[in-house]
Amino acid sequence: FALAHMVNDFEILKSYLDEGANGIESDITFSDEGEPEYTFHGVPCDCRRWCDRSVGIDEYLQHLSDLTTPGNPKFRENLLVVVLDLKLNGLSQDALRQGGLRLADKLAAHYWTGNRKARAYFIISVPKTSESEFMRTFRKELDEINFGDMSAKIGFDFTDNGDFKETQKVYEGLGISEHIWASDGITNCIPLLFRGTDRLEDLTRQRDEPGYKYIDKVYAWTYDKETSVVKALELGVDGVMTNYADFVIKVLNKPEHSSKYRLATYDDNPFEKFTA
């Protein structure tokens, strides 16, 4: 998956889809009470990016629905995965619970819109394991509003770069044992040399352990340099989040990589482990 980073308005969304990105990451902000409000990152953000793009959450989800519904004039076949990077810092546990509930409601009302034909997969990406109540109420609300079948299109991710053994315990407590993405990364402003790839290697090794069910996919963020992308591919990641989707795809298509990997299509389930 070539995951375009910080896609927070329609102009940049079109630009990345034109580059060939098959996934996007968007930042979702919340009120103090936990109401999802709009896409927005703000400063600081990645180097060489404009941090202030924004659109209202309802309008954003409706536009994504148009782009991912076959037969819609706006349909874009290559948009497969939407990572919702949830800006939850500072929210109380009550607000986290409200946030999970309300995001489920908004997906039902503005993305699936009753007919459930919009086909993108969503990754509910929570910053910290201490904010896991968001996931709990999100899942519960989908069932309560009779959208439980859409759980087949929902995955989960914690982005705190923490000890995954502890993360697994949180998933166990939530009753989540499938549709799990794991990630490791650092802002593009800091060279990968300072972050290293030890944890990324650990995640891919854990994913590939026979019978292990708490990691389906591993992705790296935010990789913009060829050396970093090549290293990620050598480690066997399933996705690279980037500010330059066309560049990542170009690297992927080089003969030394294309013999093993290709860009995912809708026939590839993002919640099934890939075996080369």
Swiss-Prot record:
Its main location: secreted. Its EC number is 4.6.1.-. InterPro entries: PLC-like_Pdiesterase_TIM-brl. One of its GO terms (biological process) is lipid catabolic process. The active site is at H5, H41 (nucleophile). Belongs to the arthropod phospholipase D family. Class II subfamily. One of its GO terms (cellular component) is extracellular region. It comes from the Eukaryota. Binds 1 Mg(2+) ion per subunit. One of its GO terms (molecular function) is lyase activity. SUPFAM superfamilies: PLC-like phosphodiesterases. Disulfide bonds join C45-C51, C47-C189. It is an enzyme of class 4 (lyase). Expressed by the venom gland. It catalyses: an N-(acyl)-sphingosylphosphocholine = an N-(acyl)-sphingosyl-1,3-cyclic phosphate + choline; an N-(acyl)-sphingosylphosphoethanolamine = an N-(acyl)-sphingosyl-1,3-cyclic phosphate + ethanolamine; a 1-acyl-sn-glycero-3-phosphocholine = a 1-acyl-sn-glycero-2,3-cyclic phosphate + choline; a 1-acyl-sn-glycero-3-phosphoethanolamine = a 1-acyl-sn-glycero-2,3-cyclic phosphate + ethanolamine. Dermonecrotic toxins cleave the phosphodiester linkage between the phosphate and headgroup of certain phospholipids (sphingolipid and lysolipid substrates), forming an alcohol (often choline) and a cyclic phosphate. This toxin acts on sphingomyelin (SM). It may also act on ceramide phosphoethanolamine (CPE), lysophosphatidylcholine (LPC) and lysophosphatidylethanolamine (LPE), but not on lysophosphatidylserine (LPS), and lysophosphatidylglycerol (LPG). It acts by transphosphatidylation, releasing exclusively cyclic phosphate products as second products. Mg(2+) binds at E25, D27, D85. The lineage of its organism: Eukaryota, Metazoa, Ecdysozoa, Arthropoda, Chelicerata. Keywords: Cytolysis, Dermonecrotic toxin, Disulfide bond, Hemolysis, Lipid degradation, Lipid metabolism, Lyase, Magnesium, Metal-binding, Secreted, Toxin. This is Dermonecrotic toxin LspiSicTox-betaIE4ii. It is found in: Secreted. Its cofactor is Mg(2+).
